[in-house]
Amino acid sequence: MFLMKDIVRDGDPVLRQEAADVTFPLSEEDQQLAKDLMEYLVVSQDPEQCKKYGLRAGVGLAAPQVGVSKKMASVLVPPVEEDGKSPFTDVIINPVIISESVQAGALTEGEGCLSVDKDVPGFVPRHDRITLRYYDVNGEKHQVRLKNYPAIVCQHEIDHLHGTLFYDHINKDQPFSRDDDMIMIE
């Protein structure tokens, strides 16, 4: 399992690189990477385990964040509905956003990142809806439509695979500026 000491911090060149495509079938090393990325999220979202291991809670973790420049990320969006189901959970490999809404969305609280220790205030404009194509750990192709928070989380993680950090999207002169029609997500 990854610990906070394993998370690469802002300033490390791997966070600014274009990650390499992952080949199938997955090597044992890539299978372990996928397992460890998801395990971090599962453990970090359990308050007792998070405290025990000194983790910061996360909803996404990309391979470059642990020093591996490959197009792989884990996403575990916590349940918001009473049924207890996550709106999106998977290890996404070689993900591509194949369509996106014109409608922009942003989190009211801004975004954070396990690789960025400082608070960077401001709205991070993203697409409110996306269609995502990716492969899972078994090499099966998936295409899913996501909106609101799950769409934002996936865009954040995919940015990591292309050497982009969330604060690159913030308007430097007016960090809290937004279009009138931007959807603000709690």
From Swiss-Prot:
Q: What does this protein do?
A: Removes the formyl group from the N-terminal Met of newly synthesized proteins. Requires at least a dipeptide for an efficient rate of reaction. N-terminal L-methionine is a prerequisite for activity but the enzyme has broad specificity at other positions.
Which EC class heads this enzyme's classification?
hydrolase
Q: Identify the keywords attached in UniProt to this record, alphabetized.
A: Hydrolase, Iron, Metal-binding, Protein biosynthesis
Instruction: Provide the cofactor note recorded for this chain's UniProt entry.
Output: Binds 1 Fe(2+) ion.
Under NCBIfam families, the record lists:
pept_deformyl (TIGR00079)
Organism of this sequence: Levilactobacillus brevis (strain ATCC 367 / BCRC 12310 / CIP 105137 / JCM 1170 / LMG 11437 / NCIMB 947 / NCTC 947)
Q: Which HAMAP family match?
A: Pep_deformylase
Q: What cofactors does the UniProt entry give for this protein?
A: Fe(2+)
Q: Which GO terms describe its molecular function?
A: metal ion binding; peptide deformylase activity
Residues binding Fe cation: C113, H156, H160
Pfam families with a match to the protein in the record: Pep_deformylase
**Ranges in coiled-coil conformation:** none
The catalytic activity, as recorded, is:
N-terminal N-formyl-L-methionyl-[peptide] + H2O = N-terminal L-methionyl-[peptide] + formate
One of the GO biological process terms: translation
**Listed name of the protein:** Peptide deformylase
What's the Enzyme Commission number for this chain? Answer: 3.5.1.88
Report the InterPro entries cross-referenced here: Peptide_deformylase (IPR023635), Peptide_deformylase_sf (IPR036821)
Active site: residue positions: E157
Q: Which gene encodes it?
A: def
UniProt family annotation: Belongs to the polypeptide deformylase family.
